Every structure is written in structure tokens, then in C-alpha cells.
Amino acid sequence: MLPRASLVSRLAIVAFSFLLLLASLFTSGCVSSNRPAPASYTAASFSVPATDDGLPGTGPIRRADWFQKTWHDRRTSFAATAQQDQGSVVFLGDSITQGWGDRLVPSFPELHVSNRGVSGDTSRGVLVRLPEDVLALNPRGVVLLIGTNDLEEGAAPEIIAGNVKLIIESLRQHDPAMPVVLCAVFPSSATKKRPVDQIKRLNQLYRTIVRDQPQVTYLDTWTLFANAQGDAKSEEFPDLLHPNTIGYAKWTGALRTIFATLGFVDTKSDNFQPEAGFVSLFNDHDLTGWGYRPTTAQDIESAKRWQKSDPAAAAWPVIKDAVNFDHLKATPDGRFEAINGRLVVTSPHEYRKIQQLWTQREFPRDFILKLEFRAAPNTDSGIYVRGPQLQCRDYLLAGPYKALKHYKAGDWNEIVITVKGEAAYCTCNGEVLETAMKVPLTGPIGLEGDRGQMEYRHIQLKELP
């Protein structure tokens, strides 16, 4: 006869295998993904598997007494709310996600959200509990932050990234159209066994994972929080691991920019009307009046030099013929899209990709151009003024104007560009960016996409006498 402990362990493995089979049926389409969670959900065993035998993924799963209790208690509570959490936006991760606590719902009042964070969890632990805790909810979307505890346990970044890739593949198999926001692992400290070089390597691998996953948006929450040395700031992470209220507020702002593009928040246009004497360059509804222009010989040569000298250089597609996007909501690849009154430069799956959208019209007369922009963390975009580019970025993180005092991270900021002759005077929220940027005597207005997501709105121009 088997010892009792061994028998219990084997029964737990059998039960876990059965749950994986149920999840497989859901993701393969044998069972409708729209049906509610199975009645047996609450009867499942939520104990940490006794061994790694037969478990998906690789790397550490914690089994300390405190973690086993946390895992069991949290997952039992998840089962109790499985029905009411159907179709929610799921926040998935470890103690940082669990730490949203009572902040989560007020942070996103427009959304039905559910918290599936388990303190102490690892990427493999998330992979193990994914079918019951997440897939069974048929989520509207998933926000994933995981990996920091794996590093503390000594797992190599490649092991962690492999598990995250499996998580993303499982989510895609369940619902290919379901958006996933993959958050970069937050900065911490070598004193927490989470050195900056390991975190940076892991986030680099995460960016690689999403290149062939169009439903996944990578959100640079590392740069959002890192200090000059690449570690957590004590004023936002008192223990150098978990964010405080300030940290969660910054994370909220970063997520809201992405949620707006996904159609989760900011779902209505503000019906903007241009100021007296101004005309709108963007009609709030589609890309009429905008298009692609042939890539210049100078840009083609710049791209070749950059890509030859730097393996990490941005992709830079060459446009051979002009293309107009009148009456279209988006460009064919979705990089530029009209969404609820905003002209959005979406985050590229390649992480960096140089693309340019231009007005079909050119502007030979002096003018004042006004617009507002909202940047996701560390975004790099730009505004072309008759050709030359004014950098438009998440300035405090991405530069070049890091000393701005009135810039509002994660919120709307106003750019005003006054062109007279061959000089452009440029401000952001009233602060001077450029006093005399040299521009040609005529040319179009353009928007650039490089890294991250940028939203533009209220794009209006007034020609001067």
C-alpha cells in the first residue's frame, strides 16, 4: 500500500491533469468558450502540486508553508467569484498584482476587473494555475506582470521568458482576439536578489516574445519606475520591491493609455471643434486627408547605415509610392488608427519601427499648428513640420526635453508650433522646446511612429496673413 502522503500527492497530480484536459477542451473549441465556468471548478484542489512531475513549463515553483497557504487561500477565493468574474479584464501576477487590493476597481471604474495575483508566485506557478484561474473566466483581456520572484529563486531570464511565452500562447489559443498587456518586470535591487542586469535581460526577452504576437502589447513599466542606476526608487517602492500608492497611480496612468486604444476606456469622442480661424487636420473619425509618402533617399540611406551598425536598430519599412487613406479607420498594418477622436500611433510589435503618416496637403504659408498628445511610458514619436521633425515623446523618460516642469506624464499635453518663414517656434504646455527650428518654405505636416504608443488629438492649424 502506498504511504498516505504519496497517495495524496498522486491524487493531486491526477486532479491537476484532469483540469488541464478541461482547459484543453476549452481552447480547442470542443467546448464553447462562452459557456460559464464548470460547476466542478469550486471542487478542485488548490494545493500546490507536491512535485514538478508532469507540470507545464520549467523553473521554480515555491513550496514554503506560507506560500502553500497563500496559494490555496487565494485560489479558493478565486473559485468563489468565478461566475461573477466572467468576461472581466484579468490582472494576473504575483504580490505586486495582488497588492492592487482595494485600489483596483476605483482605478478603472469603467471596467469589470478581477485580480488574479498570488503573492510569491512565479511564472511557472502562473502557468500551472492558468486554466482555472484565468481561462475559465473567458477574459475580455489580460494584464500580465510576472517574473521577479523567479529571479529571486535563481531562475535564468531565458527560463522565465520561456514560461511567459507558454502563458501567452495558451491565452492566444483560448481566444486569438483577446488582448494581452505584457508589463515589463519592475525595477528592484540587487539587495533583493533582483539585479538590474537580470531584469533588463528578462525584459529584452519579453520584447522578443511579442514580435509574432499581434494581440500582445508590451508596456515599458521598467523605464517608468527605474532610477538612474536602473533600480527601484524608494519613494515609489519603499521596500525596493512593492509599489506604494504613488507607484500604483503611475501604473494606472500607463495602463489607461493602452486601455483607451483597446477600447476599454475613453470610448467616446469629445466632439472637438477647432478654435476660431483654425481648421482641423484630423476629422476625429478616420484618416481622410492623411497618407503615406515615398521614403526619401536620405531616410533610406540613414536606415541602411543604422541597421548595418546596430543589430538592435529599428525596423524601417520603405514606401515606394504615395498611398492615401481617405475614409479608412486605420492603415493596413494598424500602426496609425483613428479611435474615438484620437489619431493613435500604436505600439509596434517589433518594439521599434519607424513609420511616417503625412497630410496630403502642403503648407507654404506661415501658420500656427496646435495639437495635444498623450504618451505611454518611454514612447518615442515625432511631429514633422514641412519635413523636419520635432521630437514628441514621453519627455521626462525619453527626452530630449527632460527638464520640463509642466509636462504631465500619462496625460494630455499641448504642443503649439508657430512657423514664420523658415523658422518654427515650438512649445509644450507653454514651455519652450525650440526657438527657431529650421524648416523649408513649404511641405506637409507629419506624425512619426518609433517606439511605444502615442495618441494625438485636437490637431488644428491656422494660416497667418
Q: Which residues are covered by each model-predicted region?
A:
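Solvent-exposed loop/turn segments at secondary-structure junctions
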Residues: 95-99, 119-123, 148-153, 186-190, ...
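Charged, glycine-enriched surface loops/patches
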Residues: 161-183, 201, 205-216
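N-terminal secretory targeting modules
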Residues: 1-92, 97-102, 107, 137, ...
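Structural recognition of the beta-strand scaffold that forms the well-ordered cores
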Residues: 89-91, 114-117, 141-146, 179-184, ...
